[in-house]
């Protein structure tokens, strides 16, 4: 009886082994962090990926100067923060199924559009309605980025070294947020007011959207990592 049970167990194990092997062989190639650093497409992505955290941090840091420039009440502006949170939450929940159905690469070309519209609005008017509208648009881009970036690295570079690659991306994002207040402050000091900065940043984000759109077809094709040195 023991021998027959052992034989049955071994027979059941063999197909599973074959299935696992087939799954392993069909996996897309995974890149190491060193290989990612040698990928020119990674550096082409960075100006757009780092733009949103840079801009959002800079604006929130200089919010007092912003409301003084617009002749708004600081209390009114800060009361709009719940709109930012609601927008970011709703878009985050909606972005997940979109990525599941299409891909993070598909979403890449869209997630900066709300922030670009919000900056264009701030640059063009001092009306009070611009504050809540901007918070909603900024939250939409922030929520989309939170979900999209987590999936993008997997789609582009595989999941075997995901921790190392994500840590690289997060480190660069932290660096961009750290320098944003200083850069925007220096520009204010040299005479480039916030409205002008918002207009330039809106144009910059539109260029990033165009670049992402042109790059997306290349990302949909499976790419092999360069040989390790």
Task: Please report, for each region that a protein language model flagged, where it lies by residue.
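Helix-to-loop junctions at the C-terminal end of transmembrane segments
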Residues: 91-103, 188-189
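A late C-terminal transmembrane helix in Major Facilitator Superfamily
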Residues: 159-191
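Intracellular juxtamembrane helix-capping segments at the cytosolic ends
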Residues: 144-157
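C-terminal membrane-cytosol helix-exit motif in multi-pass small-molecule transporters
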Residues: 1-23, 208-216
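Extracytoplasmic gate region of multi-pass secondary transporters
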Residues: 34-95
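Paired small-residue
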Residues: 129-137
């Amino acid at each position: 009886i023991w021998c027959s049970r052992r034989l049955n167990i071994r027979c059941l194990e063999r197909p599973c082994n074959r299935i696992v092997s087939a799954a392993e062989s069909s996996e897309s190639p995974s890149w190491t962090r060193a290989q990612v650093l040698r990928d020119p497409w990674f550096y082409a992505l960075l100006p757009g990926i780092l733009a949103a955290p840079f801009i959002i941090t800079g604006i929130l840091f200089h919010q007092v100067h912003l409301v003084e420039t617009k002749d708004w009440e600081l209390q009114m502006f800060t009361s709009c923060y719940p709109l930012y949170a609601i927008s970011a939450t709703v878009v985050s929940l909606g972005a997940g199924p979109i990525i599941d159905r299409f891909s993070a690469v598909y979403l890449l070309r869209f997630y900066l559009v709300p922030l670009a519209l919000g900056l264009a609005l701030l640059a063009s008017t001092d009306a009070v309605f611009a504050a809540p509208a901007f918070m909603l648009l900024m939250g939409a881009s922030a929520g989309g980025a939170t979900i999209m970036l987590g999936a993008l690295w997997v789609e582009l570079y595989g999941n075997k070294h995901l921790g190392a690659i994500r840590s690289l991306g997060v480190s660069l994002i932290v660096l961009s947020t750290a320098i944003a207040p200083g850069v925007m402050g220096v520009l204010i000091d040299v005479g480039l007011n916030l409205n002008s900065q918002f207009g330039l940043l809106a144009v910059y984000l539109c260029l990033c959207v165009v670049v992402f759109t042109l790059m997306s077809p290349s990302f949909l094709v499976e790419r092999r990592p360069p040989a390790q040195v």
